[in-house]
Curated annotation (Swiss-Prot):
Protein name, as recorded: Eukaryotic translation initiation factor 3 subunit D-1
Domain notes: The RNA gate region regulates mRNA cap recognition to prevent promiscuous mRNA-binding before assembly of eif3d into the full eukaryotic translation initiation factor 3 (eIF-3) complex.
Pfam families: eIF-3_zeta
Residues carrying Phosphothreonine: T128
Keywords: Cytoplasm, Initiation factor, Phosphoprotein, Protein biosynthesis, RNA-binding
InterPro entries: eIF3d
Length: 560
């Protein structure tokens, strides 16, 4: 009897599995439910899960290639341990950086450098007791001014500088003729210019009160508001210059306009001067109703005043305050009164008529001429502010100006009340840094006028927040030529800059031109402008040519 062999019992069965076909890539198309929502993190077997702190990594000082030897494993936080029981005590902390005022910046820099080994007596630092001294090479590497080593900021240069506004908007119909950069102007020189010769002298001067030389910080004196009229007449509105232009000279200007051009390389703010060429004659004018006569404050400072019109420390408000202080100080230090002697020039004040009964400031006008070569004769109106009686009986003419302190903390300046009596040189040096252009202009005006003395007053606010009340803390006097040498002001370079602009305009055709300092670049531009530009439409028809003077300014009534 034959037996039937069951092959199914001897061999295992094979069932064909279901294979998923992924047309868009490789791997399974669907994920099993057991593996869903499981976080994934790249890891290495030598990594510890949930590291609390890792002290094994060495510090890498190579900032540029700090990720060169870094590993991508163990960097996630999917398996890190979190203590979730103290969530109720968790508070958000405001990490916004608080902007410090300028006077507090860098207060603890020396202390921090001492802790980190970079201080004066720290390890590796500069020791004054003869211990360890850095070599010159290492000092240069650590000095941030050299831009290398630890001092380099890696491109972080702080906020961008603020863009200043131009003194006048350049119009589409203006043609640019020439651009003169400051490095080119600084190299100019016109030596051997002789002293100017007097043509006409006008006005009346009062004598200086010597009691103001004894004022100091402990014996301060309040600044008074002097109710006097100060004329700021431009060149073409001056009746004396109109009279002289028919017979003498071919270039006409005022001392303020000449000082602005001569000291242009020290200016940062924008300014402009209108030039009219008529035949072979040039007239330099300032525009009406502008801020040309206002005195700048901290123009050359590292941190100039902020452009906030609502603040009393904005550039324009400080300029008005400085002009107010200057005019009142120049009149207060004089001996006023009908019984006091006065120094009278040949002619009376040309800007007031005989029937006018107004109190005019003490100003003496000198109309002088200079020979600049190549048949160029300059005629300019210069000013004196006072006169001084010497012990020998001679009279010395003075240019009187005032420096003002507004807020030493905001201006990064020196406390005048602390150092003016003991370290006056440090105070003046700080003013030369912050107001280089203004002091240079005053010096040039004193040299052009032929003043024997340049008297500087130090005027400060009674309260830094109150810009309406001031006190006089002291005075100081210089000889203009010696002071020019002290502040590194070259009159040869000043004459060279003026002659360069005159020669440039002389080559042009007759018409109206404008020179303007770029508000954000060290460049002066010359524009050819239409003849009717800046013409005032509100002039009265009944006024004659000799009476069309620019407005007078009574600074005692200016609201600051």
């Amino acid at each position: 009897m034959s037996e039937t062999i069951n092959t199914a019992a001897q061999f295992p069965s094979f069932e064909k599995p279901t294979v998923q076909f992924n047309e868009k890539g490789w791997g399974p198309c669907e994920l099993p439910d057991t593996f869903k929502d499981v976080p994934y993190q790249p890891f290495s077997k030598n990594d510890r899960l949930g590291k609390i702190c890792d002290w094994t990594n060495t510090s890498n000082n190579d900032k540029k290639y700090q990720n060169k030897y870094a590993s991508s494993f163990g960097t996630g936080n999917q398996y890190s341990y979190y203590h979730e029981e103290d969530e109720t005590t968790f508070h958000l902390v405001d990490t916004a950086r608080v902007q410090k005022p300028p006077h507090q910046r860098g207060r603890f820099r020396n202390m921090r450098n001492s802790r980190s080994g970079r201080g004066r007596n720290a390890r590796g630092g500069l020791n004054t007791h003869g211990m360890t001294t850095l070599s010159g090479k290492n000092v240069k590497a650590r000095d941030p001014r050299h831009g290398r080593g630890m001092g380099k900021k890696f491109g972080h240069r702080g906020p961008p500088p603020k863009m200043r506004e131009s003194s006048v908007a350049v119009r589409a119909d203006w043609a640019s003729i020439e651009e003169m950069d400051f490095p080119r102007l600084i190299k100019l020189s016109l030596p051997n210019i002789k002293e100017g010769v007097d043509i006409v002298t006008c006005g009346t001067l009062e004598y200086y009160d010597k009691t103001y030389d004894r004022i100091n910080v402990k014996n301060e004196k309040p600044l008074q508001k002097i109710d006097r009229i100060v004329h700021t007449v431009t060149t073409t509105d001056d009746p004396v210059i109109r009279r002289l232009s028919k017979t003498v000279g071919n270039v006409f200007a005022t001392d303020a306009i000449l000082a602005t051009i001569m000291c242009s390389t020290r200016s940062n703010y924008s300014w402009d001067i209108v030039i009219e060429k008529v035949g072979d004659k040039i007239f330099m004018d300032k525009r009406d109703h502008t801020e040309f006569d206002l005195l700048t404050v901290n123009e050359s400072s590292v941190e100039p005043p902020t452009d906030d019109d609502s603040s009393c420390n904005s550039p324009r408000n400080l300029a008005i305050e400085a002009t107010f202080i200057n005019h009142n100080f120049s009149q207060q230090v004089l001996k006023t009164g009908d019984q006091e002697p006065k120094y009278k020039f040949e002619e009376s004040n040309p800007f007031i008529s005989e029937d006018e009964d107004i109190q005019v400031a003490s100003v003496g006008y000198r109309y002088k001429k200079w020979e600049l070569g190549s048949d160029i004769v300059l005629v300019a109106r210069c000013e004196h502010d006072g006169v001084l009686q010497t012990p020998s009986g001679d009279s010395q003419f003075m240019t009187i100006k005032a420096l003002n302190e507004w807020d030493s903390k905001l201006a990064n300046g020196v406390e005048w009340r602390q150092k003016l009596d003991t370290q006056r040189g440090a105070v003046l040096a700080n003013e030369l840094r912050n107001n280089a252009c203004k002091l240079a202009k005053w010096t040039v005006q004193a040299v052009l006028a032929g003043s024997d003395q340049l008297k500087l007053g130090y005027v400060s606010r009674i309260n830094p927040r109150d810009h309406s009340r001031h006190v006089i803390l002291g005075t100081q006097q210089f000889k203009p030529h010696e002071f020019a040498t002290q502040i590194n002001l070259s009159m040869d370079n000043a004459w060279g800059i003026l002659r360069c602009i005159i020669d440039l305009v002389m080559k042009q055709k007759d018409g109206k031109y404008l020179i303007m300092k770029d508000p954000n670049k060290p460049i002066i531009r010359l524009y050819d402008i239409p003849d009717n530009t800046f013409d005032s439409d509100d002039s009265d028809d009944g006024e004659g040519d000799d009476e069309g003077f620019q407005q007078v300014y009574n600074y005692a009534h200016n609201k600051i």
